[in-house]
Amino acid sequence: MNSINSTNNSAIINASLERIKTSNERLSSGLRINSAADDAAGLAISTRFSTRVDAFDQSARNANDGISLAQTADGSLSSITENFQRLRELTLQAANGTLNDSDRQALNTEAKQLTSEINRISETASFNGKKLLSEDTELELQVGPDAGDVINVGTDNLQQKLQELGLDDLDLSSQSGAQAALSSIDESLAEVNVQRSEFGALNNRLTSTVSNLQQSSINNEQARSRIADADFAKEVAEQVRNDILMKSGIAVQTQANQRSDLVL
């Protein structure tokens, strides 16, 4: 009988030790599921949620890159707008009949500097090596966890359009030339504004997309956490309980061994 009790007691001690080990592992890792043996189905589900979280986070980074692209383009377009506004101011001045040829020549010299700067900005505006204002380009932004979650971004060749509108042909050296330049400048400004509005709309859309992706990431992380994360209060209580059982078992085993020694 004593042998049976001793065996049962040893089993209790070993089981308590194993449960203490499991609790320690969960407390140290913060996870309820540390291997498939803990909960095979739960591990599969939590892994699926983790994969989605990573995908949402990367998609948000992709969308933020798109926002940076849109902001870069808008900054360049803003500078072009400022140059056109100054160019229009000079053109209005040159169109005034009170100026002489020398006055208009000075205004024309500054105007040529402005058109050169507009050309330079439209030629060099780029993001990560991709031309934004001097090429017709189609870009796909991957902004979701699945293959079809893309936003298409098109960039127009603004530089070419400005050339077609006569940017390099502006001549303020005569009153008639200045008057003719006004319509060309206004059409060019309208084209710049169209592109600014498109990049502004893209910026707003991507900002909303990032917000949605971040919320989706949070929701999936919470779902994963409910399945895979350890309940610290529960694990500590379980650890204390099993520690008491183990120590009680050891005490009983020690007493049993002492009685056996006395009998002998």
PLM feature spans:
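Primary detection of the long, small/polar-rich alpha-helical "axial" segments characteristic
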Residues: 1-264
